[in-house]
Amino acid sequence: MDATVEARILDLLLELREKTGISIVFISHDLGAVARIADRVAVMYAGKIIEIGTAEDVYYDPRHPYTWGLLSSLPVFAGEKGELNPIPGMPPSLLDPPPGDAFAVRNPQALAIDYEQTPPMFKVSDTHYAATWLLDERAPKIEKPSILKERLQENSGRKQKPDKKEMSFLQKTEQKQAPVLIEARNLKQHFRIRSDYTIHAVDDVSFRIREGEIMALVGETGCGKSTTARTLAGIYRPTGGEIFYQGARVPDKKDPFGMRKKMQTEIQMIFQDSGAALNPRMSIRQIMLEPVKISRRIRDREMLENRLREILKETGLDESILAKKPGELSGGQRQRVAIGRSLLMEPRLIIADEPIASLDISIQAQIVMLFKKLQQEKRFSFLFIAHDLSMVRFLSDTTGVMKNGKLVEMAPTKELFENPQHPYTQSLLSAIHIPDPLEERKRRLIEYEEPQSLGEGWKELSACHCVRI
């Protein structure tokens, strides 16, 4: 769900509980949403509850290293260098669980006993229990990551600080001078359902993406983000408007210079459901090499094999997965395969449509940091479509807000989050959850009153910050 709908659903659940007295079991990856709705929180790992307590216990005084890792993975706790802190490694297979504490192999604070014996539930207080040998009276005293306590104190009751370090003047100058890679001018994508009914999925949208830039598109479900991306990638032919790629207009029909073929190889897409995006009957090797063979991008077999091994290393995958099928991989591994497949094509632009929505918090952090590392190394442009506004704030340089098929606001990400001007943007940002139970319960959604028309003009408030009026 998008942020505003999610906030309304949570408020509805709380209202129903207040009126009827029902109990609610709320299962979620979203730690901000959990902070808003839950009285008690149970944290599970490898099929077992490893920590349980009141929301305040778990968020303000976490005791299990896995809980530390989950909270540290959130963008709100990104360090001064603008880096997330994902938990290393992958969850274990429940078909062959490891002995002792299942989290030990991923736990930097693991003790020798963690690899041998499963820890019991230790009592922290009357309401708080955690299954970690660190709570045994004989264990060495290891402090939780200080960043958790420091950042919670920083953000409680105040506006969040920027999640990533301010760019240097040199970086800003270089970005401004970067040439435009792709541009949409008055782009329209209409779908005629029947003779008297047409859906205006994208309606008069204009923006540009520079080389090496990360741009995000946000907005409610059905606002036209994905349709815009697919039209930009050439999956749909635009109903109206123009697309320019590297300064040349992309032809609607006849294509004597092969512009569309060039775009098909240089623009790659990564989808939300990595399972559906990978053919279940093919091996990972076949899946990754298929687009290269179709496009004949790399014809030398030895060069292709070397490039494949390089990509596996860059995306953190082992060569042993090449013989496996997608169903044998975890969600995070499948998404890494999808990223690797796109990188094999040596793209100029990657369009990622909700690429982390179905992943848990720590794996989300791993994938986002992988995106960031690869983008900095290879300098491809990146269009990031997401509902998770905290990740958008962390990752993107520029953000566009869409509503009913139109762009209503476009600005550098830092400026948009600190000074939103359009009422819809203000409503959307007010729905961002923070992992702080006491503060999250005080916050209220700014309701957006739908006008008869979103307006046809643009007002430039400052350099690169425009709002629809």
Language-model regions, residue ranges each:
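Conserved ABC ATPase "signature" region
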Residues: 71, 302-320, 429
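P-loop NTP-binding/switch modules centered on Walker-like glycine-rich loops
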Residues: 5-83, 359, 363-437
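Conserved ABC ATPase signature
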Residues: 325-329, 333
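Charged, flexible cofactor/metal-binding loops and thiol motifs
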Residues: 55-180, 413-469
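Conserved ABC transporter NBD signature motif
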Residues: 241-252
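A short, proline-enriched helix->beta-strand linker immediately N-terminal to the Walker B motif
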Residues: 344-348
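Helix-to-loop junction immediately C-terminal to a conserved catalytic motif
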Residues: 233
